[in-house]
């Protein structure tokens, strides 16, 4: 059995060596297990690429990939998956929050017959805002891209090679790993692992980054938002028709009561706002089609160590 560990790296020059050593120590507990570590520098502004090159020079089981610009975590994972040669591929973070020491929990669960197994955290070390964002993301993923309700997804997961082979066939620049997994298989499992505090620094995701990730996932792999827009349009039309009938009835029955400009203005603002929102949603889909037709790259490799 050969394991491939794929780690996107960003602002982790002081932590990635610790994570790599933890992987080495963990694999050593299962004699006969071969492994490789694929480290993808997502154009980090710190010196992590120099650290990766040093690690790769000292150990031929470590592969380093440097992207030409910051393409994002999911594109960095796709770059790593393209170079993974193991039977099982494990994804984890570069900051020590995901417990590499519990990798064989994922392996053992996968060998029960699953295609993909996610580690989940009974007690998360994330702050309240990130936990709320994770909960919102889960509910939206269940409603829009078909995530099973009983499944908990995290950035610590393992996949069989054939799943990775299917994922890397995705050519467009809007990679969203969970969406690619859910459309490839429904044979998914969970196993509980420990969630630790990061070794150093803070999350690279801002509020804007998280919102962008959600939009990317839900517009790249589902047309349900467009169908929802259709129903919202129908609902607004029915509300407008009903309001019109009510105004006519009120004028006929109570002609002395003046027509309310406040209610009319509120209605116009509501309908106008909904129209702009739905036009923005449609524009997002059209823009993605345009970018895909222009063959924008999913990632560009500047340098590699192998």
Outline where the language-model segments fall:
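Acceptor/aglycone-binding surface of glycosyltransferases and processive sugar-polymer synthases
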Residues: 63-69, 73-83, 88, 97-175, ...
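Short conserved micro-motifs on helix faces and helix-strand junctions that flank
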Residues: 8, 67-69, 92, 157, ...
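Solvent-exposed polar/charged
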Residues: 57, 82, 108, 112, ...
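Protein kinase-like catalytic domain
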Residues: 24-27, 168, 294
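Hydrophobic helical membrane-anchoring modules
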Residues: 176-306
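Structured catalytic core of nucleotide-sugar glycosyltransferases
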Residues: 1-126
